Amino acid sequence: MENLAYAIGYYRKKKGYSQEQLAERVGISRQHLASIEARGMNRGLSLELLFNISTVLDVEPYMLLKFKIEP
């Protein structure tokens, strides 16, 4: 899940959105989004929310799930 957390943050920043802006567009609180993006997140992420985030960020869901962190 750590790569997913990084992927969401990466694509959010690439789109120029703050956490507040993305959270508002997706329909969750900024705190919820922050917990999703947190390293080693323990908060669950539904498929519906994953699809909503990927739609707003204009990326395919698999791109979030297959995201690779370069050393």
Residue ranges and their predicted role:
Residues 13, 24, 55:
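Alpha-helical residues within the helix-turn-helix
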Residues 28-43:
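Recognition helix of helix-turn-helix/homeodomain-like DNA-binding domains
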Residues 40-55:
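Short, basic-rich loop-to-helix N-cap that marks the start of a DNA-contacting helix
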Residues 8, 22-23, 33-36, 64:
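Conserved hydrophobic/aromatic packing and binding residues within compact polymer-binding modules
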Residues 58-71:
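Short C-terminal boundary/hinge segments that cap the last helix of small helical domains
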Residues 1-14:
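A short, Lys/Arg-rich alpha-helix, primarily the initiator
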